[in-house]
């Protein structure tokens, strides 16, 4: 008969595509999964069964060997992160325009149980932004998000500020629209420090929505993962 896996907690569902393909290529058995990504408690994760009525022991042993000794499917619970938010931009800092970025970020974080515990408004001063990133990290936040100042305009210096904070940059730029000017980095102890482009403020879904579940779950995001987003990375503004 069929066996189903369901999520016991809210979290990030991930899988090893190469090994899943290898197991399904053996024949006489199958594993069907949902796409990797955020799930809620009670969501179906996978279904599996043998195809014939009976199956040889040797075939099952081959499947176990092919699957390997590490989990083929993984559900990682979200962590209750403390987040530092650095909102940059002289227009916002001097009150010429309203800060519309912060409410959006707080709402997106709340979806995954994360909370902004440190927040500051700063002008386009990369040294001040760098100093505040370091201060938030020293205060023990689990992640720092910097909004604004991510384009190629000469006044936009947030990428420089992040790099000067002593982090390890994974990527500056992503093959996703909207969200191409995204910056992802990590501290030496694995805390994410990100630069968010302006599209995160007004677009329903961006690169930030793709990586945020990984950041909250504590699953490292690699340069290869970001590059792979190019296939399907063009948002068509589907109603979801």
Task: Please name every model-derived segment.
Residues 69-124, 128:
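Glycine-rich phosphate/diphosphate-binding loop of Rossmann-like nucleotide-binding domains
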Residues 12-13, 53-54, 91-95, 201-203:
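Short, acidic Gly/Pro/Ser/Thr-rich loop/turn segments
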Residues 41, 79-83, 140-141, 189-191:
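Short coil/turn connectors at secondary-structure junctions
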Residues 7, 49, 87, 195-197:
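Pocket-edge structural micro-motifs
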Residues 1-78:
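Extended, charged alpha/beta regions that create polyanion-binding interfaces
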Residues 90, 100, 117-240:
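Short glycine/threonine-rich loop/turn motifs
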């Amino acid at each position: 008969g069929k066996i189903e896996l369901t999520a016991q907690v809210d979290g990030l569902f991930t899988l090893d595509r190469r090994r899943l393909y290898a197991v399904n290529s053996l024949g006489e058995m199958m594993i069907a999964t949902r796409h990797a990504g955020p799930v809620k408690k009670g969501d179906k994760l996978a279904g599996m069964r043998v195809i014939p009525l009976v199956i040889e022991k040797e075939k099952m042993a081959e499947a176990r060997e092919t699957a390997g000794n590490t989990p083929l499917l993984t559900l990682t619970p979200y962590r209750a992160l403390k987040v530092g938010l650095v909102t940059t931009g002289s227009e916002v800092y001097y009150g010429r325009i309203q800060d519309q970025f912060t409410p959006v970020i707080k709402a997106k974080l709340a979806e995954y149980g994360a909370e902004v515990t440190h927040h500051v408004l700063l002008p386009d001063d990369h040294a001040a932004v760098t100093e505040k990133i370091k201060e938030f990290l020293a205060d023990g936040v689990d992640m720092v998000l910097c909004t604004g100042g991510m384009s190629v305009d000469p006044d936009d210096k947030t990428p420089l500020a992040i790099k000067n904070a002593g982090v390890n940059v994974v990527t500056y730029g992503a093959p996703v629209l909207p969200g191409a000017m995204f910056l992802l980095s990590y501290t030496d102890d694995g805390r994410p420090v990100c630069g968010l482009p302006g599209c995160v403020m007004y677009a329903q879904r961006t690169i930030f929505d793709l990586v945020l579940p990984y950041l909250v779950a504590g699953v490292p995001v690699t340069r290869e993962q970001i590059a792979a987003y190019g296939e399907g990375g063009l948002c068509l503004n589907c109603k979801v």
